[in-house]
Amino acid sequence: MNYMKRRLLLFAGILLLVALAGCSTTDPITSESEGIWNHFFVYPMSWLITTVANLLNGSYGLSIIIVTILIRLALLPLTLKQQKSMRAMQVIRPEMEAIQKKYKEKGSKDPKVQQEMQKELLGLYQKHGVNPMAGCLPLFIQLPILMAFYFAIMRTEEIRYHTFLWFDLGQPDYILPFVAGITTYFQFKMTMSHQQQMQKTNPSDSDNPMANMMQMQMKVMLYVMPVMIIIAGLSLPSALSLYWVIGNIFMIIQTYFIVVKAPPLEVEQTKQKSSKPNKA
């Protein structure tokens, strides 16, 4: 369920962005803007948007599309590392559960027993070269970058005076937010469907209260997130809706190839078992 937890955390961050958009400063960002966040995060993103737009004859719409894709591609190695770490944790999960079951029978509330269990789990992680925290670090690196780009779009003054396709980038649109909401739904649905499929291969999940609670939260978010995106998009500059649409499409493709098309866990677990040296 680790993947679901991280997805929920990421979408919680997006919800925070939506909320902050309504109450944060909308002063134009410039090289003279004060503060570490403005100077080292938001302004460089704004500069990149403007530079790419200038190369495209002033098309800020195309610039937002291209920069969104470039940022997502730049973050792809982190995403792959995160997915690899989570995948490794899922592969060794049967061994982890066996250790936890063994110490539960011994009396898991005993501090000494807990210490022994943690020591054995740590040995298991080291044996397979797995770091349980490795999947979290990429997420905390991605969020500031995505937030900076988000606010750069909000505060780059030149964007406000340009159009793209049928909409004015500086004004709310009444079509694009629904496209953003629909793509958000499909992105989340794809992740949720994969997790439900994974749960079928792990019967212990059906009896796990935490896993069931996460499933319920995912079901709620499946409908809450698209609605939040649509409501926000109807009141925010359409440049942000464009960013959400392109980002969602990229994430749908990424999730399909990295998560959905990944080999079944059973295959990797079988490989792992066959690679173990036979005891004489």
UniProtKB/Swiss-Prot annotation:
CDD domains linked to this entry: 5TM_YidC_Oxa1_Alb3
Top-level taxonomic group: Bacteria
Signal sequence residues: 1-22
Protein name (record): Membrane protein insertase YidC 2
Lipidation sites (S-diacylglycerol cysteine): C23
Family the UniProt entry places it in: Belongs to the OXA1/ALB3/YidC family. Type 2 subfamily.
Gene Ontology biological-process entries: protein insertion into membrane; protein transport
Pfam families on file: 60KD_IMP
Matching PROSITE patterns: PROKAR_LIPOPROTEIN (PS51257)
Keyword terms: Cell membrane, Chaperone, Lipoprotein, Membrane, Palmitate, Protein transport, Signal, Transmembrane, Transmembrane helix, Transport
Cysteine pairings via disulfide bonds: none
Membrane topology: Multi-pass membrane protein
Transmembrane regions listed in the UniProt entry: 60-80, 133-153, 163-183, 227-247, 248-268
InterPro entries: YidC/ALB3/OXA1/COX18, YidC/Oxa/ALB_C, YidC/YidC1/YidC2_Firmicutes
Subcellular location per the Swiss-Prot or TrEMBL entry: Cell membrane
Protein task: Required for the insertion and/or proper folding and/or complex formation of integral membrane proteins into the membrane. Involved in integration of membrane proteins that insert both dependently and independently of the Sec translocase complex, as well as at least some lipoproteins.
NCBIfam families: yidC_oxa1_cterm
GO cellular component, as recorded: plasma membrane
Lipidation (N-palmitoyl cysteine): C23
GO terms, molecular function: membrane insertase activity
